[in-house]
């Protein structure tokens, strides 16, 4: 088993989320929230990953972490489960811009579900101590470090190896891990909204700040791409590509099938179009929907796209 074992994990996670549902949602959204939650939990259970969520939740509770003490990274913050467990303050059902659960959960199970979070230095120390004690009950098989500082654990693998990196390296996908990297909130606030896109556009709304964050931190999206499209008046800020969700939304807007839109968005996100070009079925789908040329050309320049939920979480937490 690659996830930590917790007896009756599926039931415990369902009960935990159900108890939080009516606290977090008003009556008019309860039905929608319950349907989304059931879909998310059904996939989490299919992955046999309920224990992963409980492991992280229990760890944060055990060390007395409050929402202000951590900020989760990546796509998992796009889930109602994350909102109910206070892993994010952003409600995926009502937030603007939108975030989509299929980017956090899909049916392919290509990698194990893992968690990465920025935490305060105090919470980092407490989590290190917590997992030292935890290892007497469960197998904390690998730890990872930067400059001697532990910032995460792998759980449930039979081999014991340590990983040394910079907190954002290519972590293995074949084992569950929980990364809790200590950050200085004040230093991060200073750098978070720096970059040419922020300087030129001077965003005022949350949505525009989210877009500029993506234009700054994704790769191959601003210079010789969105910058030119905006300068020439071809498209406005809201339409340029900064995240894979931007690709997904425009394709849906033009009537591309949702499943194909998802595949194309993920293909663009990884920079595969730039390296290998379009697949024939993708070209056919976009041409049939009259997707504009500027968009397909913009996609070919993308090296990597951040998930929108990641940018939203950072801006909501630190700005």
Task: Name the predicted role of every residue range.
Residues 29-71:
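Helix-rich "cap/lid" substructures immediately adjacent to catalytic or cofactor-binding pockets
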Residues 1-17, 59-62, 69-72, 76-319:
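Mg2+-dependent phosphoryl-transfer active-site scaffold
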Residues 23-27, 46, 253, 270:
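General structural signal for alpha-helix termini and helix-helix connectors
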Residues 1-41:
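N-terminal leader/propeptide and maturation segments of large enzyme subunits in energy/redox metabolism
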Residues 25, 48-51, 214, 255:
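Short coil/turn residues that cap or connect secondary-structure elements
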